[in-house]
Amino acid sequence: MEVLIRALGRADAAAVGALYQQSAAHLRSLGDDTDFQFDAHAYLRDGFGPRPAFSGIGAFLDGQLAGYLIYAFGYETDRAIRQLYVLDLIVDERVRRQGIGRRLMHYAATLCRDAGGGELFWGVFERNELAIAFYRRLGATEVGGSRFMHLPV
């Protein structure tokens, strides 16, 4: 199985949107009641232009998008460390457990290091035990002592 990892582009919008919808259906089946709104239109609107909100890398198998990782760079002031925030890591359910997610995370780690960063950071739905187990196998640990909050504006 030859997997090509490359930056995502505008032409990947439909495939990204389709994989996102597959992931949203999986999370709903686990009880996630988020109003999942990301789609090909949001990908194009927010990922490109003069001030893109995120970047992405894709794993391609036989020319088809098999998985992707969308990220944004950030900074953690308490520890004075640059971070790569993983917004989404999604692998097509038909090709899971074949190393695609691992390869995307390793590629993201390289992007982070190359940008002067020191860690990857992300959130995971608390009932997504398969994802949590995968991240633990990578060596990730849970962050304690903080709660994530949001405030619509």
Question: What positions do the PLM features span?
Answer:
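A short, internal acetyl-CoA/4′-phosphopantetheine-binding micro-motif in the GNAT/acyltransferase core
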Residues: L89-R96
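Conserved GNAT acetyl-CoA-binding A-motif
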Residues: R113-G123
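Conserved GNAT-fold acetyl-CoA-binding loop/helix
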Residues: Q21-R45
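Conserved beta-hairpin
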Residues: F54-G67, D92
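A short beta-loop-alpha structural element at the N-terminal edge
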Residues: L4-A18
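A short helix-loop-beta-strand connector motif used in the catalytic cores of GNAT acetyltransferases and
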Residues: R45-G58, Y85
